[in-house]
Amino acid sequence: DVKKSESLMRVNHMGEVCAQGLYRGQAAFTKNTKVKEKLYSICEEEKTHLSMCNSRLNELNGKRTIFNPVWYLASFTLGVIAARNEKSWQLGFIEETERQVKIHLDESINMLPEKDYKSKKILKKIAVDEEKHRKTAKDIGSKKLPDSIRNSMDILSKIMKKITYHV
């Protein structure tokens, strides 16, 4: 049970590392000051999530994935690409990311061992914040991403999660 909790929390920790890269990449390169402010605000909440996952991994004597630097760089690059396309789908990218993250968090909560109340509590708190981020993007004018981008994001995240679960 501890091993399963450790693996799932490692995946969620990686997700928060990616969130830092994604939102920092977007914030650094967007020209829209309103969006930039929102992105940096979201970054602060994501940093809290990262700290929560990090602390829980420590309690479980768990390891972080060795791929975190790669995932961060890839996410930062995606953030830059999204920022460069701000007129067409930057906010949609945020909304879709948070939608997929919320689904993943719900799955993680259900997969955790029944008695791992602490990890479940952390992920439930994070899920509430992620839904708030999704709503914020929608409220400030996000546009739905093309299905090809949404599907690519989903496939890429599944690959990353599978690798991170084990390494």
Give the ranges of each region predicted by the language model.
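Non-heme di-metal
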Residues: 1-167
